[in-house]
Amino acid sequence: NFFLGRYEAPLPTSPRCNARCLGCLSLQKTGEISHSQDRIAFKPTPKEITQVALFHIERVKQSVVSFGQGCEGDPLLAADVIEPAIKEIRSKTRRGTININTNGSRPGILAALFDAGLDSVRISLNSSRKPCYDAYFRPKGYAFDDVIKSIETAGIKKKFVSVNYLNCPGFTDTPEEFDALSELMRAYPVNMIQWRNLNFDPKRYWKIMSAVSRPGNPMGMHRIISRIKESFPDVKHGYFNPPKEKF
């Protein structure tokens, strides 16, 4: 999209991550499965980030620029370059939407980025239940409560919140998962759900989830999505980060 001059441009920044997701796209240490793309090996400077972002914003109508890509770790670990970059971008233009895709592990840092001019956040979850989240994300140095706090922080700052909901039929569409997601959405500000197909062996995933929970009988993804839409009619559904003109 960046080279084609349209939609959402990536701003990869972080070589490090504080989660060890089983299906990580950019790092697989065991060799048991391969990663689909190499992780960025350096941290760009605020100036470099700003130049790329402004180039895209200035030539694309309703543009989006996003930190947190499949080819990097988590961008909250690179806030030392992201925060000044956001400030510099916003000193030059109010156009464009600045978004961050993240695991939401550091709510305090996320709050500082919002104050700098960040417009929206997409936070990844495979489950709204802590044992199931921990079994897949395998967090290092943060807890599930930090992720929830980040969602809450975005709401307090009145920023647009998307959940990057990693779903796998047979688990995601169980009554337990539906109830947990519904409870999360009633308690915290979620503006959009991005229903993301989980890039992981579904049989292996089910076994891992079954070891930490007792999944009930699946209801079907279509029914789950329909029930969420009925219960939360104001929540948007999609697959991509929207520009602020469509919040």
Each language-model region and where it sits:
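Auxiliary Fe-S-binding modules of radical SAM enzymes
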Residues: 1, 179-247
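N-terminal cationic-hydrophobic initiation segments that often serve targeting/anchoring roles
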Residues: 57, 90, 114, 155, ...
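Core AdoMet radical
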Residues: 8, 28-109, 115-147, 191-194
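Conserved strand-turn element in the central/C-terminal portion of the radical SAM core barrel
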Residues: 138-140, 150-177
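Catalytic cores of alpha/beta
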Residues: 108-115, 170-187
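Active-site beta-loop-alpha junctions enriched in small/polar residues
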Residues: 70-72, 103-105, 126-128, 166-168, ...
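Alpha-helix-loop-beta-strand connector modules within alpha/beta enzyme cores
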Residues: 79-95, 144-159, 214-237
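N-terminal pre-triad scaffold of radical SAM enzymes
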Residues: 2-29, 64-67
